[in-house]
Amino acid sequence: MVKVKFLGHAAFLIEGSKKILIDPFLSGNPKAAVKPEEVEADLILVTHAHGDHIGDAIEIARRSGAKIVAMYDIANYISQKASDVETIGMNYGPTTIDGVFIVQVPAWHSSSDGVHNIGNPCGYIVKLDGVTIYHAGDTFVFGDMALFNELYGPIDVALLPIGGHFTMGPREAAKAVELLKPRKVVPMHYNTWPPIAQDPEEFKRLVGDKAEVVILQPGEELEL
């Protein structure tokens, strides 16, 4: 069994034979379900360099011994800030790390420390214990999402932003569901702050019977 726990905003903890933490923005996150010191991980996947995604990755990696996986340039950026943390740089494509199959896939967004561009944004497809999970990162919908299902599907659960303003809104995310064809979908990256206020029930209505929409509150988990 694999558990997907929503930690708030775009942060998730995937628990199976390994613990995989994605975009651990916890400190300063008004929706965070846990504190950084309460999280253990084997791998930390970072989708891009914005502070609400890279978050507490370094602190958690230092304490838990987790490896940080990120776009090559972002991995180098992290290494410069924390030479004692093990990083693994990628540049889109598949790999296997500690027995976990990971595909770093494109995302339409930006990636910076707020001033300087750092690498490119991405999403991740993770296969753990026979379960396939897609975390989109911050992105708009794009046609090549259909390839993710074609190459690596079926996708058991897609974690999709619906907040609009910086990412897809409910309408665009519902279109992404059509392209990805996941069995289940969990909305994320909404209602953290006023600019990304959305009603997840509207997203659920737009998806209809194309997938099962599971609306998780921070701290809740989905068992697969």
UniProtKB/Swiss-Prot annotation:
Asked whether the UniProt record includes NADP among its keywords, one would answer no
Tell me the protein family, please: Belongs to the UPF0173 family.
The record's keywords, sorted A to Z, are:
Hydrolase
Q: What is the lineage of its organism?
A: Archaea, Methanobacteriati, Methanobacteriota, Thermococci, Thermococcales
Q: Which HAMAP family match?
A: UPF0173
Q: Which GO terms describe its molecular function?
A: hydrolase activity
Under the heading PANTHER family, the entry gives: UPF0173 METAL-DEPENDENT HYDROLASE MJ1163 (PTHR43546:SF3), UPF0173 METAL-DEPENDENT HYDROLASE MJ1163-RELATED (PTHR43546)
Q: Any idea what this protein is called?
A: UPF0173 metal-dependent hydrolase TK0141
Q: Which cysteines are joined by disulfide bonds?
A: none
Species of the source? Thermococcus kodakarensis (strain ATCC BAA-918 / JCM 12380 / KOD1) (Pyrococcus kodakaraensis (strain KOD1))
**TM helices/strands, residue ranges:** none
Gene3D superfamilies assigned to the protein according to its UniProt record, in alphabetical order: Ribonuclease Z/Hydroxyacylglutathione hydrolase-like
